[in-house]
């Protein structure tokens, strides 16, 4: 479960193995993983969603079409990301609020993550 502040956020979400089946696009068409639509629907409209993928820019039109077809909203996509670790470094708020959170999910298991927003953070 994610317990988050009510401040606007930036969500950085990998595509393959997280939103769509890993390398599914190589078999023809992407397959949406369980819980993804529900998870994305719980992200407030004023939050920024940045998707990231190792897919090349040549896949842009097809990928954006499939995301829209499945109703997955996003603000921006980074293509051609390396396949290694993704590292986020951010400062901590003076209040002590951690502004960098990492969630690792098992490949192709979907996004069955509960989100709760707290006034206390």
What positions do the PLM features span?
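HAD-like aspartate-dependent phosphatase fold
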Residues: 1-121
């Amino acid at each position: 479960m994610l317990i988050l502040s009510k401040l606007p956020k930036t969500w950085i979400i990998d595509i393959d193995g997280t939103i769509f089946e890993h390398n599914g696009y190589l078999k023809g068409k992407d397959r949406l993983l369980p819980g993804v639509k529900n998870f994305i629907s719980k992200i407030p409209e004023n939050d920024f969603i940045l998707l990231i993928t190792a897919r090349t820019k040549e896949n842009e039109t097809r990928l954006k079409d499939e995301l829209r077809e499945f109703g997955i909203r996003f603000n921006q996509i980074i293509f051609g990301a390396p396949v290694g670790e993704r590292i986020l470094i951010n400062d901590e708020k003076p209040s002590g609020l951690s502004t960098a959170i990492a969630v690792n999910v098992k490949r192709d298991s979907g996004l069955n993550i509960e989100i709760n927003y707290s006034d206390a953070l």
